[in-house]
């Protein structure tokens, strides 16, 4: 049996400003730094054998706040890097609505049918993240590990492990610094919990939109 903790990075200024992040290397803001410290504390008593992170700094800093309690290194893991938004990267959501009205509407309505201009599709993200997860399961047989990634990869992984296709993307919530727990036993996935942020209550921050 293996436990896989899937964590989203902490808050950045671009989350608050509803700016498409993707491969842009945006650091955590002060709230994000507080969030990831609490996320790390929430997992400090768990038995963890490895911590993997998207190579982007917002995820790496989140992962380091988890790994430090277990005295294990953080391993950058390219398969879980954020989606490439291509031409949308660095643009505010409202700007994208105005510049790409039909494509933005399709993204909101049928996200599985869109490929971002100069970027990726959800199917491409699913292919690389699930292949990466399978490789780690083979490497860490009967061990527990953490993956720290981003909103889109996390939602796609959750859909896959729930047996859902990518059309269900918007039905999965992934708040900043949230944790999901999946248990792999006898070749099957068991979902223990999704989008846990109970450890962030002390911050008293308002909920952001799904961005």
Annotate the PLM regions.
Residues 37-104:
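Phosphate-coordination/substrate-recognition cap region in phosphate-metabolizing enzymes
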Residues 5-62, 69, 115-130:
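Loop-to-helix element that buttresses phosphate recognition and phosphoryl-transfer chemistry
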Residues 2, 47-49, 141-145:
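Short coil/turn segments at beta-strand junctions that form active-site/ligand-binding loops
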Residues 19, 79-80, 109-114:
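Short linear capping/connector segments at secondary-structure termini
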Residues 192-211:
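Acidic, His/Gly-rich catalytic cores of divalent-metal-dependent hydrolytic chemistry
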Residues 10, 151, 197:
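Active-site metal-binding loops of divalent metal-dependent hydrolases
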Residues 60, 131-190:
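Active-site-adjacent alpha-helix immediately C-terminal to a catalytic or transition-state-stabilizing loop
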Residues 5, 75-77, 192:
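General small-molecule cofactor/ligand-binding pocket signal
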């Amino acid at each position: 049996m293996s436990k896989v903790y899937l964590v989203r990075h902490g808050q950045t200024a671009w989350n608050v400003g509803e700016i498409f992040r993707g491969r842009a290397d945006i650091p955590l803001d002060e709230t994000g730094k507080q969030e990831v410290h609490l996320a790390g504390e929430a997992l400090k008593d768990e038995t963890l054998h490895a911590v993997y992170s998207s190579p982007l700094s917002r995820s790496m800093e989140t992962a380091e706040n988890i790994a430090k309690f277990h005295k294990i290194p953080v391993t950058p893991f390219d398969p879980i890097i954020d989606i490439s938004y291509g031409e949308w990267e660095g643009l505010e959501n409202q700007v994208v609505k105005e510049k790409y009205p039909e494509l933005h509407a399709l993204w909101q309505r049928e996200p599985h049918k869109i490929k971002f201009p100069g970027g990726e599709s959800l199917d491409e993200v699913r292919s690389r993240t699930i292949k990466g997860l399978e490789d780690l399961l083979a490497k860490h047989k009967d061990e527990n590990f953490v993956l720290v990634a981003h909103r889109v990869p996390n939602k796609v992984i959750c859909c896959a492990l729930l047996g859902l296709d990518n059309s269900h993307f918007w039905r999965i919530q992934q708040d900043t610094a949230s944790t999901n727990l999946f248990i792999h036993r006898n070749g099957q996935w068991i979902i223990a919990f999704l989008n846990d942020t109970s450890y962030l209550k002390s911050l008293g921050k308002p909920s952001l939109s799904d961005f």
